[in-house]
C-alpha cells in the first residue's frame, strides 16, 4: 500500500483505476484515458496532483539560498510577487536532481518539486540550507488540484469567492497568488503540465474533496495519470527520470533556457560543470520525433542517425490522441551534420528500422498542432 492523497476515497468512488506512482496510490484513468485527454484539450479536466511536494522557504537568507541551490536565478522574480520560475536543481556534476517551480511569495518562496524524488530532494535542500539562515517547511497539509483546458478558468471562477474570482481574472501566465477561501488560505497558480491554459490550486486537505466534487458537478472531467502523460508529451514537456536525471545535464534536456548564466558573479551548484560542458561543446540534445505511419514510438528504443556510430535513445514516446499518430522525445548525439527539424532518422522497432521525422520538442499547444 502506498501513500494516499486526501482525494483517494473519491477516486475509488468515481471508478478510478489505482496504480502506484512514485510510492503514491494514484488514479491512472477513470475508464478512458483517451476521452480524458480530449476533455482537457477541448473543454476542461482536473487532476489530483497532491502527491507533488510543496516546500515553503522562509528566513533572511531565502533568496541567497535559492540563488545558490538553483540553476535559474530567483532574482528574476524581484518585485514580482506571485511570479513563478522554472528551474533545475543540480548536483555538482551538472546533473539534474529534480526540476521544479518556485514562486515569489513576497518575503519568502514556495517551491514545488516532484513526488518520486521527494526524499532525495528534501535531503539535498536541507543539506544546502545548513549554510544559510533559512527554514524549510514541507506543506503536507495542502492538497493540489490541477484544472486544465480552455474552459478551466471560467468554470473554476464560478465555484470560488468573489475575491478569488477577481484574483484569478488578474493572474498572468506563470503567476500564483494566495486568496482567502472558505476561511482558509488557498493558492491559485496559472500553471500546468498539459499545454493548455488552466490553474493549479493548493488548498487544505480537508476541503479538497468538496471542491473536487463541485468541479465534477460543474462539468470538469476527472483525469488520471495516463492522460496527464500524453498531454505533457504532446506539449513537449520533460518528465523527470525520462528526459533528465542526475546523470543528464539541462543542456542535454532542452533546459538550457533555464540556466541563468548572468550575472557571472552568481555561483550556483553545478555551474562549473555546465561551463566546462558548454566550452567543450554539447554532446547530446533533445529532439522531437514523429511517426505518421502505423506503430508506436516507445521509451528506450534506439535512434539511428546517418553518418554516426553513436545511437540516440527515445526518452518518452506514445500515441498522440490529438494528432492521431505517434510522437516521441529523444536524446540524440550532436553530430557534424546536426539533426534539426525537417531531417529524418531511423528508430529500431521490433528488429526493423523505421524512418521518422525530426521536429522541435513540442507537438500540440492550446489545442493546436505544432507539427
From Swiss-Prot:
Task: Give the residue spans that cross the bilayer.
Answer: none
EC number(s) on file: 2.1.2.10
Q: What class of enzyme is it?
A: transferase
Statement: the UniProt record of this protein carries the keyword Hydrolase: no
For this protein, the record's InterPro entries field holds: GCS_T (IPR006223), GCS_T_bac (IPR022903), GCST_C (IPR013977), GCV_T_N (IPR006222), GcvT/YgfZ/DmdA (IPR028896), GcvT/YgfZ_C (IPR029043), TrmE/GcvT_dom1 (IPR027266)
Say yes or no: keyword Transferase present: yes
Describe the protein's quaternary organization and the partners it interacts with.
The glycine cleavage system is composed of four proteins: P, T, L and H.
Q: What is this protein called?
A: Aminomethyltransferase
What organism is listed for this UniProt entry? Cellvibrio japonicus (strain Ueda107)
**Source taxonomy:** Bacteria, Pseudomonadati, Pseudomonadota, Gammaproteobacteria, Cellvibrionales
Task: State the encoding gene.
Answer: gcvT
Amino acid at each position: 500500500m502506498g501513500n494516499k492523497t486526501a482525494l483517494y476515497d473519491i477516486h475509488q468512488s468515481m471508478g478510478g483505476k489505482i496504480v502506484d506512482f512514485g510510492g503514491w496510490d494514484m488514479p491512472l484513468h477513470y475508464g478512458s484515458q483517451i476521452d480524458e485527454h480530449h476533455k482537457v484539450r477541448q473543454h476542461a479536466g482536473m487532476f489530483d496532483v497532491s502527491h507533488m511536494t510543496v516546500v515553503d522557504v522562509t528566513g533572511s537568507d531565502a533568496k541567497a539560498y535559492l540563488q545558490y541551490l538553483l540553476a535559474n536565478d530567483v532574482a528574476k522574480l524581484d518585485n514580482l510577487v506571485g511570479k513563478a520560475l522554472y528551474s533545475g536543481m543540480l548536483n555538482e556534476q551538472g546533473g539534474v536532481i529534480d526540476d521544479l517551480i518556485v514562486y515569489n511569495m513576497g518575503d519568502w518562496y514556495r517551491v514545488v518539486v516532484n513526488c518520486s524524488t521527494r526524499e532525495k530532494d528534501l535531503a539535498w535542500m536541507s543539506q544546502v540550507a545548513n549554510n544559510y539562515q533559512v527554514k524549510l517547511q514541507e506543506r503536507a497539509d495542502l492538497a493540489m488540484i490541477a484544472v486544465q483546458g480552455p474552459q478551466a478558468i471560467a468554470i473554476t471562477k464560478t465555484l470560488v469567492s468573489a475575491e478569488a474570482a477577481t484574483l484569478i481574472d488578474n493572474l498572468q501566465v506563470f503567476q500564483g497568488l494566495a486568496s482567502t477561501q472558505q476561511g482558509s488560505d488557498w493558492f491559485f497558480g496559472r500553471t500546468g503540465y498539459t499545454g493548455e491554459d488552466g490553474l493549479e490550486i493548493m488548498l487544505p486537505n480537508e476541503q479538497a474533496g468538496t471542491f473536487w466534487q463541485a468541479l465534477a458537478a460543474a462539468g470538469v472531467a476527472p483525469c488520471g495519470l495516463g492522460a496527464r502523460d500524453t498531454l505533457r508529451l504532446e506539449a513537449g514537456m520533460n518528465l523527470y527520470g525520462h528526459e533528465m536525471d542526475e546523470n543528464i545535464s539541462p543542456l542535454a534536456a532542452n533546459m538550457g533556457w533555464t540556466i541563468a548564466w548572468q550575472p557571472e558573479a552568481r555561483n550556483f551548484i553545478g555551474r562549473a560543470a555546465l561551463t566546462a560542458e558548454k566550452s567543450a561543446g554539447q554532446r547530446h540534445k533533445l529532439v522531437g520525433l514523429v511517426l505518421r505511419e502505423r506503430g508506436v514510438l516507445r521509451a528506450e528504443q534506439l535512434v539511428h542517425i546517418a553518418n554516426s556510430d553513436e545511437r540516440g535513445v527515445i526518452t518518452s514516446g506514445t500515441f498522440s490522441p490529438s494528432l492521431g499518430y505517434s510522437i516521441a522525445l529523444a536524446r540524440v548525439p550532436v553530430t557534424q551534420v546536426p539533426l534539426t527539424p525537417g531531417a529524418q532518422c531511423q528508430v529500431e522497432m521490433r528488429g526493423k528500422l523505421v524512418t521518422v521525422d525530426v521536429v522541435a520538442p513540442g507537438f500540440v499547444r492550446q489545442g493546436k498542432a505544432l507539427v
